[in-house]
């Protein structure tokens, strides 16, 4: 069976197979029931109020002393723990405290007997150290260590301490009055000097403050310049890094685009090659065959057109020669006719002229009445006497024709009525 204990306690296991007994301070231990037994001892710190009433000092003056001591069983030291177990195992904390208290009180009384009241009263530290030293060397053999010892109180029933203090008090009061007067004197001197030093110190302080402010402003300006410079450098470096990063990204993007474009070009080239092959198979070969056929047809049509052009040229040439011959024959016939007319005019003179005039007279009448044929509407205005309507138009035309011989005579000097009067009658 396992048993445990805290750091303020120690366990001692004895019995079967436990020789010497096992001591465990703050831990656990295995115990065989019935054949082994376990005991515990406290390691708590004990506070002891050590009182020594009416102890005679070296000069025979009885006084009472009260001290405060802190003691405990030392569990970390195996030898001291073994000694404590031998001395106090099975005892309560109160019993252990009583034993330690009696031991300390005895040593305290012994130290008091070897010292005077003045030594104990004036040098408490020396008294405490002697009690601590003597008691520790004795209690350590019991496994107890003295943690601390302090002198708490000193008093007596004979007013020895009070009487001892009166002379000292009177001397102290005298010294106090003298010291007070000297202090006031020195205080006045020191006060004046202090005021002077204060003014000087204040001036120096203001000067130092001004210098410090100046140095602060200068250093602050320097630091601000450096900080702004570093910040500007950092911003510039950041911008440069951003620009470099953007440039790298752009270069990578361009490289990717170049690769993609190269891949696209390769794909397009493959597609072009495939289409060229397809075009070669589907279009070019049939087109070349068709071109060859069309070239043959064009050459045949060209030859045919050349032959047709040559035939047309020959036909035009022959037609031109025929027309030229016809024109020449017509001209010769007209010339002969004109010659014959000239002979007839020579022979008949005025009769021939009259015949020619009469031959052209219908044309003259046609030209005179031509404007009337192109008129869309004719409006006649009459005063109420004479003919009306179409008879009026006919009369007007006949009136114009009746005046024609006069016009011919004025233009040519030939009188149609006279020539007609002198013309001999034709016989059948």
Curated annotation (Swiss-Prot):
Localization per record: Cell membrane; Endosome; Membrane, Caveola; Melanosome
Phosphothreonine modifications at: 387
Modified sites of kind Phosphoserine: 19, 163, 385
GO cellular component: adherens junction; basolateral plasma membrane; caveola; cell-cell contact zone; centriolar satellite; COP9 signalosome; cortical actin cytoskeleton; dopaminergic synapse
One matching Pfam family: Flot
Acetylation in keyword set: no
Physiological role: May act as a scaffolding protein within caveolar membranes, functionally participating in formation of caveolae or caveolae-like vesicles.
Leftover remarks: Expression increases at least 10-fold as 3T3-L1 cells differentiate into adipocytes.
Similarity comment text for this entry: Belongs to the band 7/mec-2 family. Flotillin subfamily.
Protein name (record): Flotillin-1
